[in-house]
């Protein structure tokens, strides 16, 4: 098993160097729609329907009254983890495309936070180094459940969605969660012993 960045995973799938992938469905939908098919998917208490369990939260400081919707982030500095298959950046880019804007040039800059360090996105936003941050859906709730509530009153989620199947704060449409896609054309998996 290997941990690959989104770009490396795309190249590996295209080169047919992998048979089984564990990645958010956004990767499957946006980066490899014709190369992989879903074998199984993960569900959670926050999203019992695996087909609608992954989204992203766009956060801003509560005192940034100039930032009310995703549209207001045009030309702004955004912090995000971008070298994972999808911690939220792909879902947000999809929302930007729905605004009839080019997601590759919409933001003024994207401040890259190292993978597995999503909490640093909060630091960028709270310190003012970024105007907004992109988090995976349920990241805030996971921090709060772990007892880290120091920033709760200082941030808000833009375009917060409710009642769509995910019991966490999020700004984007929902996608299937973490499927286990198999490369099309892979040899059949042997039966379990």
Q: Predicted regions span which residues?
A:
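Short beta-strand->loop
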Residues: 37-51, 106-111, 145-174
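A ligand-binding cleft/hinge motif common to bilobed small-molecule-binding domains
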Residues: 22-35, 92-98, 126, 131-162
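Extended ligand-binding regions for polar small-molecule ligands
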Residues: 61-64, 74, 151-193
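Solvent-exposed coil/turn segments that connect beta secondary-structure elements
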Residues: 18, 23-27, 44, 62-65, ...
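Short beta-strand-centered segments that line the small-molecule binding cleft or hinge
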Residues: 18-22, 28-55
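Hydrophobic residues within well-ordered alpha-helices
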Residues: 13-14, 73, 125-126
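Extracytoplasmic small-molecule ligand-binding "clamshell" domains
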Residues: 1-30
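Bilobed "Venus flytrap"/periplasmic-binding protein-like clamshell domains
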Residues: 48-123, 138
């Amino acid at each position: 098993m290997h941990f690959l960045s989104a770009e490396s995973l795309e190249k590996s799938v295209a080169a047919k160097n992998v048979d089984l992938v564990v990645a958010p469905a956004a990767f499957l939908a946006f980066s490899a729609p014709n190369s992989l098919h879903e074998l199984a998917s993960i569900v959670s208490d926050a999203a019992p329907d695996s087909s609608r369990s992954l989204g992203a939260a766009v956060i801003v400081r509560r005192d940034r009254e100039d930032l009310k919707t995703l549209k207001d982030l045009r030309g702004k500095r955004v912090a995000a983890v971008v070298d994972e298959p999808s911690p939220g950046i792909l879902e947000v880019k999809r929302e930007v495309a729905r605004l009839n804007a080019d997601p590759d040039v919409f933001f003024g800059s994207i401040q890259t936070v190292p993978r597995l360090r999503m909490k640093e996105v909060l630091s960028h936003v709270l310190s003012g180094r970024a105007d907004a941050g992109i988090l995976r859906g349920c990241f805030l709730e996971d921090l709060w459940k772990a007892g880290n509530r120091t920033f709760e009153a200082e941030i808000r989620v833009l375009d917060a969605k409710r009642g769509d199947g995910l019991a966490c704060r999020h700004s984007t449409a929902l996608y299937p969660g973490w499927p286990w896609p198999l490369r099309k054309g892979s040899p059949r998996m042997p039966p379990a012993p």
